Design a protein with these regions (language model features):
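Pocket-lining segment of extracytoplasmic ligand-binding domains
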Residues: 118-203, 208, 213, 218-220
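Short glycine-rich His-centered loop
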Residues: 28-53
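Ligand-binding clefts/hinges and TM-proximal coupling segments of bilobed small-molecule sensing domains
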Residues: 146-163, 229-287
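Acidic, polar ligand-binding/catalytic clefts
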Residues: 59, 63, 71-133, 196-205, ...
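Beta->alpha turn/N-cap motifs
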Residues: 34-39, 73-78, 86-100, 123, ...
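Extended ligand-binding regions for polar small-molecule ligands
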Residues: 52-65, 124-127, 132-133, 137-138, ...
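Periplasmic-binding protein-like
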Residues: 36-39, 113-121, 189-230, 252-274
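Bacterial N-terminal signal peptides
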Residues: 9-19
Length: 287
């Protein structure tokens, strides 16, 4: 099955104003996507719209599903975004961490990343990342986020300071309002500094897949999205230069996330090994 990869130039997708009150039509030429959280490396607001790993994944899904464009909307909370998918007001959301509770309300695609809850703090910290070391410490979190729930479960004695949005939580950490920031691995890594930050623990609390979600009744889009994500991972495994550039610019060795090529290959190999390989005409990249 041939793979169709979006040029990097289109990764900064244009935003078209969208009213969430309009149901997403199954036969629409527009793929309606909702952005839960404007956070690196999945989404970054630009002058013309959004760019990020989530945007690039949505471009692959757009092409596989035969849509002409992706139309983005933003929401004020994760719950509002979930509700938009559940009610069919939008088609899809990408970059969403898997939880068993959510899986009863929406369908998840194959994951294209792995996340988990970690802590961002100054490099000279005395906290070692164990639950005991967090006792009595104040940690900033996004209100009602999976990370806030995980931290409360693994470290009941921690003092969580909730913020309404990731931007507010990050600003509080950067200003020194909170000494520790708790959240998803990719988000924290993308906003960390190798010289001044520590990201703990080494193995995240509560690891989970990161994928896309669609309405429970939209099996056709779910299938197309899985094919698109599977093709992307297989093309990366096959050494396709364009795919490797697309993925690695956001989460690879030269990004703030800093995953190695071997690490990304291992993840994608694991996912494909429990599903199926997809044949792709890869254009080899230099190792």
């Amino acid at each position: 099955m041939p793979i169709r990869l979006a040029p990097i130039a289109v990764a900064a997708a244009l935003v078209t104003p969208m009213a969430l009150a309009t149901p997403a039509a199954a036969n629409s030429t527009t793929l309606k996507a909702v952005v839960f959280e404007d956070v690196k490396p999945l989404y970054q607001k630009t002058d013309t719209g959004y760019e990020g790993f989530g945007v690039d994944v949505l471009e692959q899904i757009r092409m596989q599903s035969g849509r002409r464009k992706v139309e983005y909307s933003s929401v004020d909370s994760v719950n509002e975004g979930l509700n938009a998918v559940i009610t069919g007001k939008v088609d899809i959301a990408c970059g969403v961490a898997f939880t068993w509770e959510r899986s009863t309300k929406v369908n998840y695609t194959l994951p294209f990343g792995i996340g988990g809850t970690r802590l961002l703090m100054a490099s000279d910290t005395t906290v070692d990342g164990t639950p005991d070391s967090l006792s009595g410490k104040t940690v900033g979190v996004v209100k009602d986020s999976p990370a806030s729930k995980v931290l409360k479960n693994v470290a009941p004695e921690v003092n969580l300071k909730p913020y309404n949005t990731p931007a507010e939580a990050l600003a509080a950490y950067n200003s020194g309002d909170v000494p520790i920031l708790g959240g998803g691995t990719l988000w924290l890594a993308a906003n960390s500094s190798k010289e001044t930050s520590a990201l703990l623990p080494f193995r995240p609390y509560g690891r989970s897949g990161i994928g896309c979600i669609v309405n429970l009744n939209n099996g056709k889009l779910l299938s197309k999205a899985n094919i698109a994500i599977g093709q992307m991972m297989q093309a990366y495994m096959d050494g396709d230069a364009g795919t490797r550039h697309m993925v690695e610019r956001w989460i690879g060795p030269e990004s703030n996330v800093g995953l190695t090529r071997v690490g990304i290959e291992s993840l994608y190999s694991l996912i494909l090994n429990v599903t199926a390989e997809i044949s792709t005409p890869a254009a080899p990249a230099a190792r």
